[in-house]
Amino acid sequence: MAEICYENETMMIETTATVVKKATTTTRRRERSSSQAARRRRMEIRRFKFVSGEQEPVFVDGDLQRRRRRESTVAASTSTVFYETAKEVVVLCESLSSTVVALPDPEAYPKYGVASVCGRRREMEDAVAVHPFFSRHQTEYSSTGFHYCGVYDGHGCSHVAMKCRERLHELVREEFEADADWEKSMARSFTRMDMEVVALNADGAAKCRCELQRPDCDAVGSTAVVSVLTPEKIIVANCGDSRAVLCRNGKAIALSSDHKPDRPDELDRIQAAGGRVIYWDGPRVLGVLAMSRAIGDNYLKPYVISRPEVTVTDRANGDDFLILASDGLWDVVSNETACSVVRMCLRGKVNGQVSSSPEREMTGVGAGNVVVGGGDLPDKACEEASLLLTRLALARQSSDNVSVVVVDLRRDT
């Protein structure tokens, strides 16, 4: 009897387990089916109709509340992501704050004008370069810029002047960053420039009308008068007979001295080196070169040297403008006359009287011998002044190329 009861109890337990298992399986199937149906409803494309105007689409199935709940959930998660991203951006900006370079104040850009004309010469051998902010000095709140301008008067051919135009400002920047002494850095810059020109001639890398046939290329050289303008100083380095003139309180002040063979100290130096100055259409080194210093002219070394004379002038409130020009201007126009012409232009007394397209009258303007860096445009008044000086030189029968740079130094304009 006990065995029958035990067997019945065992069968009942197995039957109950089977029923529970079937019920559980059925429930899971129903839950899975319900979940799949819900998923299909969520993923199916809702039919909606457009209404005129800017109203939102109206859903036909009346599921707007569920849609809004989903949108609020997405918006919350998006806000969280945006907040985290914003925090990362802030941290990144804080980490980079020490490396951010302040842009120069637009008012700090120099006002200048350039004119370079072939004049009565058959070939254009002058070159001009202007590089605003060619060297920058970063402070905590601003970027102080140094401005560079230079005039190069070539002789024998144009390739030395062109090389100076392309390279000398880079050498000046490199040397000044290595040693802040302007006189030493300028001297090293000119020496390196001279060595590069000599190497250029020896290697035959330049392509020009002298055809690199020695000794023709050894007879090619260029003057160089360059100026670096800082907020406190006017630095001028000169090698040759181009010139820099400052107008201060209406008076002309020469910031360079022409290197002519008959200048007493230059004559003594040439003779001490074993050279001679022969008067042939004016004083000339060995009767050939009308200047005692130049970049290049390898065949006249050591009598003709490339070492520049450097002047450093403190800027003052009375500074009006600076003129750099080749001897094509200074041979026929005095310092005082040149300053008077520029002063009239800057005061607007000749505004509109100078043609804006001088190429039709003067060969060489815009002929590719002028390089301007920094992305800014020349000042109209300074441009008119430089162009008027070239016209004055031609009117006074200048027989040379004429190149002029005018820089406005007034602080209140």
Swiss-Prot record:
EC number annotated for this UniProt entry: 3.1.3.16
Segments for region (Disordered): 21-40
Textual note on the cofactor: Binds 2 magnesium or manganese ions per subunit.
One of the GO BP terms on file: chloroplast organization
Domain PPM-type phosphatase: 111-409
Entry keyword Magnesium: yes
Residues bound to Mn(2+) 2: D153, D327, D400
SUPFAM superfamilies, per the entry: PP2C-like
SMART domains in UniProt: PP2C_SIG, PP2Cc
Residues that coordinate or bind Mn(2+) 1: D153, G154
Disruption phenotype: Delayed senescence. Increased sensitivity to abscisic acid (ABA).
Keywords of the record: Golgi apparatus, Hydrolase, Magnesium, Manganese, Metal-binding, Nucleus, Protein phosphatase
Gene3D superfamilies the UniProt entry points to: PPM-type phosphatase domain (3.60.40.10)
GO cellular component, one term: cis-Golgi network membrane
Family matches, as InterPro entries: PP2C, PPM-type-like_dom_sf, PPM-type_phosphatase-like_dom
Pfam families with a match to the protein in the record: PP2C
Family: Belongs to the PP2C family.
Name under which the protein is recorded: Probable protein phosphatase 2C 78
Species: Arabidopsis thaliana
